[in-house]
């Protein structure tokens, strides 16, 4: 049914309007009572539970940052079967993001180009919402992805990130430090070790024991990935999230004119899968065995998720395929993982 709805209705809507419609519908699951029914249909098999970051994740599969920037649909996403929800990216101050249009589908590639620009309601508002959510026993694990406020100069980034950390860390299960979005000027430069070291050190200290992971770009050279993994180990971070969106437009099926018309931004979805898997393997080789690696990028099926777990991921996230697969995507992933693991 969803493929028909996507083909005939949603694909003809502005992508951002369609996303808003979907996220609003998901946020209404709990108060409508439909969430209880959904949970009975989507609850992950107990065998899928993962213990990491000092937490129990009911499934290794969660929602990547970007889908629920302001934590308005967390409970509904949990009721759809996602084991964790990474909200954000959130910044110290509310900001509108880049001008629209800023989200573009590449349907032939099952991909998306976005240049959202960290549009969000600010860290204080997010913290208030998460404080209320933390009282709910039926909530999923909640990570908070933090980024640099656009108007803050790169040289002032440490203070900006620390301000956000102090607001959201007390109500987060873990923090993800976003230094890899291509849509905030100067942000990716923070992945340089000389800039990254003081930033991560300050965030780690401000987080006051809340697990901290750093999210990296797929466009880094292999040696740069290794150096960041070594730094994460040196600083005692909980792990690494790999990867964010890519600037590459190589090997796309979509007509080149359509891709060019979309313009600048990060590409996510199926074309990212090969590089995301390569980066995962590098990280697993370099990081300690107990470090948490969250693999994200190009995940579509249960087999995709299992291949990331087999390659060393602790957890796996998805987002873009959610737009193409629909609301029962997490249920399909969890059911597929249970079948793969069932003794034969």
Swiss-Prot record:
What are the protein's UniProt keywords? Cell membrane, Flavoprotein, FMN, Membrane, Oxidoreductase, Pyrimidine biosynthesis
One GO biological process term: 'de novo' UMP biosynthetic process
Named in its record, the pathway it takes part in is: Pyrimidine metabolism; UMP biosynthesis via de novo pathway; orotate from (S)-dihydroorotate (quinone route): step 1/1
Query: Catalytic activity annotated for this protein?
Result: (S)-dihydroorotate + a quinone = orotate + a quinol
Give the cofactors, semicolon-separated. Answer: FMN
Q: Where is the active site?
A: 181
Stated membrane topology is: Peripheral membrane protein
Position of the signal peptide: none
> Where does it reside?
Cell membrane
Matching PANTHER family:
DIHYDROOROTATE DEHYDROGENASE (QUINONE), MITOCHONDRIAL, DIHYDROOROTATE DEHYDROGENASE (QUINONE), MITOCHONDRIAL-RELATED
Recorded protein name is Dihydroorotate dehydrogenase (quinone)
**Species this chain originates from:** Clavibacter sepedonicus
Q: Which gene is this protein's source?
A: pyrD
